[in-house]
């Protein structure tokens, strides 16, 4: 079964989630989201396109808006020092047909599961982190304990078909897939080279296209 989830990254002026975790992002015309995205691509290149990815489902609160979301993420960034966390993205629905309704998604990209688990354990004991969650609970609440985890790989990196968007925005589509009977992870990985070759033999220049699995 295939489920389609269309989302739009909320970055730049709205600046919902897009963040370089070790840096603060100013919300003005000098926004550096594009630089942060370039740093993310550099990190992926250093890992051969591999990442440990986690997705948290989030619910918008009664005070959710661009200004409050920006304040929330700016405050969060000041609490994060983990070098193993090299990519953070946020998604909001871009179509009424979104398979997940009005759910927001917060994506974390780590170097490894072990490093991610260690940082989550530290976060659970972080009093400042708990205070932050309480302060902004009317803006947005995310299900950290119920996060979905994946071993991810980017066969085609985001800068392959054009420079990254300086604003930090990008449009994404997600397909939720199940193994057919008798198939496994090895079969899924064996599928990737053929699909990647098909993309490379097509005209995607200037689109900024990339994909992850």
Regions found by a protein language model. Give the residues of each.
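Bacterial N-terminal signal peptides that target proteins for export
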Residues: 2-9
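C-terminal motif of bacterial Sec signal peptides marking the signal peptidase cleavage site
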Residues: 17-20
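Short S/T/G/P-rich N-terminal loop/turn motif that feeds into the first structured element of a domain
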Residues: 22-105, 109-213
